[in-house]
């Protein structure tokens, strides 16, 4: 009895190996796509955190503006870049606390529009005290709390077939 060799079996093994290898590559590509989307969302959250911290530092530096509620803000329409230049540059050194607060808010809105897609912002500060101007300058930091909310459109979390963006929000309650 003669044993006949089976022809073409090696080619079938190679085709199965190529199929398994290509499925593995497609899985790796999907993993890479999810990683890029997640990394972008984390980057946007980091930008919002840095911008919020920067605004809180500006508020702490302008104690009178903070006590006089000059930093309260609500934007309803998404901010677009470039924003209009601040009304006052405060370069002459003759700015009031309200001028400094107005400039701080204008610069902050410009930064939001530059670094986040379709952002809106809200700052609301509330205190239970109403001290005099001299007391404001000598008292410890602001006695109330401020709430800051930054929202932006995050297109990285939406299915690719839709044109809508998911709204992401950064909320922070702090004492300046």
Place the predicted regions along the sequence by residue.
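Aliphatic-rich helix starts adjacent to a transmembrane/signal segment
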Residues: 2-53
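Flexible, low-complexity segments enriched in proline/glycine/serine and punctuated by aromatic residues
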Residues: 16, 40-45, 49-176
């Amino acid at each position: 009895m003669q044993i006949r060799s089976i022809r073409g079996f090696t080619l079938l093994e190679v085709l199965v190996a190529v199929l398994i290898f290509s499925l593995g590559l497609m899985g790796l590509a999907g993993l890479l796509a999810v990683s890029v989307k997640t990394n972008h969302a984390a980057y946007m959250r980091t930008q919002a955190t840095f911008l919020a911290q920067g605004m809180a530092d500006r508020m702490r530096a302008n104690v009178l503006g903070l006590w006089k509620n000059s930093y309260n803000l609500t934007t309803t329409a998404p901010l677009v870049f470039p924003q209009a230049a601040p009304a006052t540059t405060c370069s002459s050194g003759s700015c009031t606390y309200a001028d400094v607060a107005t400039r701080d808010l204008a610069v902050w809105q410009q930064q939001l529009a530059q670094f986040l897609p379709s952002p809106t912002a809200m700052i609301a500060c509330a205190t239970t005290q109403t001290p005099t101007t001299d007391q404001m300058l000598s008292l410890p930091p602001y006695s109330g709390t401020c709430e800051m909310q930054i929202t932006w459109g995050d297109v990285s979390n939406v299915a690719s077939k839709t044109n809508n963006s998911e709204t992401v929000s950064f909320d922070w309650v702090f004492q300046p």
